[in-house]
């Protein structure tokens, strides 16, 4: 008769630990990202592009979803950062776009290419950090036509 209470106790103990272990498993994230020309560039703003001149603004638009497809905002993630192959990091912010009359709420960040930045193709990645500290990384396909490309020339905005 002593086996019954021992088995019951072991079963209850096991059931109590199982949910704890499941709670520690991180949820996979899905990242979708693109690059567009920032406002005031050599072409229309917010249009997909991967070729930019120096002094132009590169803008990244990013969506992060959990395993159920739910969009994650600043309350659902610790951070979203674009990391360049040269080590530069650009933290993204969550907000409405376009700013004056939002039609989408996304993560975004931008970078004005320095006048002395080298030309060529450069890899980058997007790193999303979940609230539990786990990270998910997205990178574009590693072929020159899809990478950030700095072309010869320097953009000079028109005088106002």
Enumerate the predicted regions with their spans.
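Bacterial N-terminal signal peptides that target proteins for export
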Residues: 1-9
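Bacterial N-terminal signal peptides
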Residues: 8-16
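Beta-strand-rich domain onsets/edges
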Residues: 23-59, 63-65, 152-160
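Short structured motifs
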Residues: 44-48, 89-96, 106-112
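Short flexible loop/turn segments that cap and initiate beta-strands
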Residues: 52, 65-93
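Aromatic sugar-binding surface patches on proteins
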Residues: 99-112, 118, 122
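Internal, hydrophobic beta-strand segments that form the core of beta-sheet-rich folds
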Residues: 114-142
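Short beta-strand elements
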Residues: 132-160
């Amino acid at each position: 008769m002593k086996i019954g209470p021992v088995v019951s106790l072991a079963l209850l103990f096991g059931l109590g630990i199982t949910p704890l272990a499941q709670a520690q498993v991180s949820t996979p994230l899905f990242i979708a990202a693109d690059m567009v020309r920032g406002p005031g560039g050599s072409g229309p703003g917010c249009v997909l592009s991967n070729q930019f001149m120096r002094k132009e603004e590169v803008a990244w638009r990013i969506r992060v979803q959990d395993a159920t497809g739910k969009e994650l905002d600043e309350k659902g993630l610790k951070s979203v950062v674009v990391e360049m192959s040269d080590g530069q990091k650009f933290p993204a912010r969550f907000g409405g776009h376009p700013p004056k009359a939002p039609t989408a709420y996304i993560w975004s960040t931008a970078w004005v290419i320095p006048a002395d930045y080298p030309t060529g193709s450069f890899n980058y990645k997007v790193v999303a950090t979940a609230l539990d500290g786990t990270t998910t990384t997205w990178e574009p396909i590693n072929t020159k036509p899809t990478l950030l490309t700095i072309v010869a020339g320097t953009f000079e905005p028109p005088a106002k």
